């Protein structure tokens, strides 16, 4: 019934299976996966409100509460995605990690958010790169013909 309503409203739909597990997002800056954040929304889904309203009380854990071995695997996958997709500069890859330790890459964002509420600047800050340094790095990197 819901699908029929949606098909009446939209021309096409994509249906994906829900993967139960932790939401981990990993930043790649240049030639290094610098770190990750675990997203713990208080809402049922990590939607617009959970991302951008302080009243949503979404928790960001840096580093994520996973084993160091699992975190290293995730960072390697994020970096590999960055390279395979021929990305330059900054990317953010989003993952789901099941209780069994299975890693699912959901997407790689080639233009991740760069606001004060965005995850890449937050991850960079926790690894010693404040917002000004991050933006300056991006400007300098944009001038490199690789």
Locate predicted features:
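Phosphate-binding site of ATP-dependent enzymes
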Residues: 1-76, 99-104
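Beta-alpha-beta core module
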Residues: 117-120
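Active-site "cap" helix and flanking loop/linker of ATP-utilizing ligase/carboxylase catalytic domains
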Residues: 38-91, 122-146
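Conserved metal-phosphate-binding beta-hairpin within the catalytic cores
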Residues: 17, 26-28, 82-114, 124
């Amino acid at each position: 019934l819901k699908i029929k309503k949606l098909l009446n409203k939209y021309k096409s739909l994509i249906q994906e299976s829900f993967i139960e597990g932790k939401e981990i997002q990993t930043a790649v800056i240049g030639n290094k996966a610098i770190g990750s954040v675990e997203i713990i929304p208080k809402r049922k889904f990590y939607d617009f409100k959970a991302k951008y309203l302080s009243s949503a009380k979404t928790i960001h854990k840096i580093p994520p509460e996973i084993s160091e071995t699992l975190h290293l695997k995730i960072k390697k996958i994020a970096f590999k995605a960055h390279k395979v997709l021929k990305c330059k500069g900054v990317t953010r890859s989003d993952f789901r990690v099941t209780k069994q330790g299975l890693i699912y890459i959901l997407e790689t964002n080639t233009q991740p958010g760069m606001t004060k509420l965005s995850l890449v600047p937050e991850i960079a800050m926790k690894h010693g790169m404040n917002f000004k340094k991050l933006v300056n790095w991006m400007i300098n990197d944009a001038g490199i013909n690789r």
